[in-house]
Amino acid sequence: MQDNKDVFRRIERQYYRDRMGTLGLSTVEGMLLRWLGKQGQTRQEELVVQLVLDKGAVARALARLEELGLVERAVSDRCRREKLVSPTPEGLVLAGAIQQSVEEWNTVCFQGFSPQERALFTDLFTRITQNAMEYKQGEKEHG
């Protein structure tokens, strides 16, 4: 018997892989660009933490996004080891297309839900995500 979570995750991953592929991006590149489109200039390390991604994967994805002219990286004035990442105007346009894909996926997923059901789901899922992030942080701190 298949777990509904597993089925949902597979379908969602395929959806985003397909959508990002049509934009010429990997899913990680899409995640980063979407974040930068919403948040603006961000420390590279903050992207790792907020998106719960591997440092190496983030560095590789940002290097490719930089090659494509979608982001710019600069050394911070505060700390020479710290890199700041900003979306370019072209990156912001693509971030908008990525956000549209996210909204389309949400429309698919919440079809037939009342506003109250959607709000309840969002609240519960936010709490689940916070629990998972706290677990992950504890794992890092305690080995």
Please report, for each region that a protein language model flagged, where it lies by residue.
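N-terminal leader segment of winged-helix/HTH proteins
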Residues: M1-L23, E139
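Short capping segments at the starts of secondary-structure elements
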Residues: Q39-R43
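Short, locally clustered residues in the helix-turn-helix/winged-helix DNA-binding domain
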Residues: R9, R34-K38, Q99, T126
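Residues within helix-turn-helix
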Residues: Q44-E45, G56, A63, K83
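Charged, amphipathic alpha-helical coiled-coil/dimerization segments
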Residues: R13, A63-T126
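C-terminal regulatory/oligomerization modules of transcriptional regulators
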Residues: Q116-G143
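Residue-level detection of the helix-turn-helix DNA-binding "recognition helix"
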Residues: G21, G37, V52, A63, ...
